[in-house]
Structure formats: structure tokens, C-alpha cells
Design a protein with these regions (language model features):
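Hydrophobic h-region of N-terminal signal peptides that target proteins for export
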Residues: 16-23
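Compact beta-sheet-dominated domain cores in extracellular/mature segments
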Residues: 2-13, 25-189
Length: 189
């Protein structure tokens, strides 16, 4: 974990929200990224680098929350309007929280990658957490969703290298042409 200075106003704290994607009914875990035509929803633990993939959104949230949210809606689209689910997210302890979800397609479509980290981000002008994407997720991200008070910075090279785009402070159904399908590392601030 590396801290890196960024120019970020410290006055805005993003809400924990969930964007839309469609889940496929089956909770069987798989490894890697799904074959064409089938979306997978993966959760990645930033500390260990361990990634598990599932066919349902509910299963990913169960794992990402450490079992504290076992009854999430079947799709992220349904979760957006679910006040009980939002309250459950906000009640998670400050350790091992969901920091962001990244989608293969615009409008929160296709496969998704939910990244879990050790805590919420501080609004102190620094990148609090950084992650180099595994090969199967490099150059695939088209929409993003920040959680746990994190703003997302997207970089075209590993190690937060190259020109960055962001911060993405709220749900972004299309990240724009600068980093669309070019992200290789992510800064969480």
C-alpha cells in the first residue's frame, strides 16, 4: 500500500451506493473471468489479492461484506433503490469494507469486480490505497462505482503510472474516452 499526494478537495464525502447490473441466477463460485456471453461478478480482497467470482450479485456482496450482508438484492440495479440494503452497507465496520465496484461495460453492464479493502478512505489529499489489476481485468473497465468514502483514480499503467483520470466521486455509468478499456491500476483516495 502506497500513499501518494493528489489534489483533492477534502469537503465532499461520497455516499455508499450501488449501481445497476444484471445478475445471472446461479451462486456457484468460479475462478477468473467468464466466457463471452455470460457476466460474472467477482470480489477481490486487496490485501491478499484473492479473487472469487460468482454468477449472482447477492453472492458477491455476501463474500465482500464478510457474510454481514447475506440477503442483498439479486441485482445491483435492484440494490440502488433498496433502503434496507443501503443501511446495511453503511453499518459495516470500518475494517474490511467494499471500496469500489468496476464494470466491464458502460451503464454498469457486463462482468463486475468489487474490491474490498481494509477501511474507508480519508479525505486528506492522499491516495490511501492502490491496486494493480490482475491481467484478466486490465483494459476492461468502462463504468465505476465508489464506496466507503473513496474517490477513484484510474491509471493506464501498473503502480499508478501514466496520466490518471478522476477522481470519480460518484457512480459513473461511463468513465469517458480517456480511460475506457485502458485501466491497469486504481488509486483509492
Amino acid at each position: 500500500m502506497t500513499r501518494r499526494a493528489v489534489s483533492v478537495p477534502a469537503t465532499v464525502i461520497t455516499a455508499l451506493v450501488l449501481a445497476a447490473t444484471v445478475a445471472i441466477p446461479s451462486a456457484e463460485a468460479t475462478h477468473g473471468v467468464a466466457a463471452t456471453g455470460s457476466a460474472e461478478h467477482c470480489v477481490l480482497d486487496m490485501a491478499s489479492g484473492e479473487q472469487s467470482c460468482y454468477r449472482t450479485f447477492t453472492a458477491v456482496i455476501d463474500l465482500a461484506s464478510g457474510g454481514e450482508i447475506a440477503d442483498a438484492p439479486a441485482s445491483a440495479r435492484a440494490a440502488v433503490g433498496d433502503s434496507t440494503f443501503r443501511a446495511d452497507l453503511q453499518s459495516l465496520e470500518a475494517n474490511d469494507v467494499i471500496q469500489g465496484t468496476f464494470f466491464e461495460d458502460e451503464q454498469y453492464g457486463g462482468s463486475s469486480l468489487t474490491i474490498r479493502g481494509s477501511g474507508p478512505c480519508e479525505k486528506d489529499g492522499w491516495v490511501d490505497y492502490q491496486y494493480d489489476l490482475p491481467d484478466e481485468w486490465k483494459n476492461r473497465i468502462s463504468s465505476v462505482q465508489p464506496w466507503a468514502e473513496c474517490w477513484l483514480w484510474l491509471y493506464p499503467e501498473p503502480g499508478l503510472g501514466g496520466d490518471r483520470d478522476g477522481p470519480f466521486k460518484e457512480n459513473s455509468p461511463a468513465i469517458g474516452s480517456v480511460m475506457n478499456d485502458r485501466t491497469q491500476s486504481i488509486g483509492f483516495s
